[in-house]
């Protein structure tokens, strides 16, 4: 009888551990990455990686990380001296609110006009924060500027994930500050496949 009870406890513990591990890679949340599956049909999101900065029962919002634009940030911040020489280019953050600009910065907390997304990565849509961070000549060099964002209504993203159109991964800074935008999507898609395979062994 004790043996049977022990087996039951082990099975329950193992099941709970598997569920917990699986939810880490399937449950969306702020600070998670969305990696578009090969089946993605929406042309705006084909081969994209999105960093979620907001997620709730009312909807979700994120930034497309791997769509750099051939436009220098100095075009929208001409008042910042020396910005053109930094070769910092704008990124297409998504199809919603194309007139809104966002900053992702890794480093010290910029203050109450910025939100922490994960670890020491912060997001802000405040112009004064952007001007200060972009104007630094030393210190926080890891930053990107985005125009627009990706948005989902209540339950919409969950349906897309359930339909297999997105893979959910924990965020890391490599996905943001990549060296080759043409390779980063495939790298994270492969990583997702490996993680999913490890969960079903």
Predicted segments with their positions:
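A short aromatic-anchored loop/beta-hairpin motif
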Residues: 20-201
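Bacterial N-terminal signal peptides
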Residues: 4-16
